[in-house]
Amino acid sequence: MGFPAAALLCALCCGLLAPAARAGYSEERCSWRGSGLTQEPGSVGQLALACAEGAVEWLYPAGALRLTLGGPDPRARPGIACLRPVRPFAGAQVFAERAGGALELLLAEGPGPAGGRCVRWGPRERRALFLQATPHQDISRRVAAFRFELREDGRPELPPQAHGLGVDGACRPCSDAELLLAACTSDFVIHGIIHGVTHDVELQESVITVVAARVLRQTPPLFQAGRSGDQGLTSIRTPLRCGVHPGPGTFLFMGWSRFGEARLGCAPRFQEFRRAYEAARAAHLHPCEVALH
């Protein structure tokens, strides 16, 4: 979703620095909590959070806020930010600011992906979010709150889908090319079987319980492979609408860590991945080495 650059720049340049935005920081400046009731009409509050993890809570949203994430030079390297709304998320929309002033919608009022949304900024883009209050006729209590995680992009040469971006709510098998990229770039790569699947209707998520026979990679540590007499059970989450159900055989589970939880990216049967990997390796087209044995 894009907005004219001129409109954004006008809002940022002409808006007043809201007094409410200057207060409300946590001691370490990782989080912010404030209210739109003390914000001057038409103002754009300027916020800056320097930590890799934190939270924002905007009570009675009014006007707009511009939030910069990262250290003193947030444009030094490409970065990936993930936002997870606190439900019910109401009263505002959250956009990622893009080069040229365009805005990309990340969070909106109403139901959405329980796991949140992620955005990737390039090396010349400022890591900034634009929070805009949505108009309402009544004065009911509304809260727009979310947690965020920010990390450096260690493989900026790879396409966005390799970082788990743009797959929120996607329910389709991964192509061979996507499988190979996922094996090289996912936060975790687990060889195991499905022990069971449960469904959380409230969060609109399915929870896959996996017996991890072998952990090929994990960053940060999320799983422990089963030892003799001990099953290494772990949980991986995926959107409910994907209709995941238990199946026989061994799989290669690949995905990303979001707020301490494992979220599924691709889960081919192990033999299916082996076939794709060995074919790519024979043609010298594999993006990285994967220890299958």
UniProtKB/Swiss-Prot annotation:
Disulfide bonds join 30-51, 82-118, 171-242, 174-266, 184-288. Keywords: Developmental protein, Differentiation, Disulfide bond, Neurogenesis, Secreted, Signal. One of its GO terms (cellular component) is extracellular space. It is found in: Secreted. InterPro entries: Meteorin-like. GO terms for biological process: axonogenesis; glial cell differentiation; positive regulation of axonogenesis; radial glial cell differentiation. Residues 1-23 form the signal peptide. Belongs to the meteorin family. Monomer. This is Meteorin. It comes from Homo sapiens (Human).
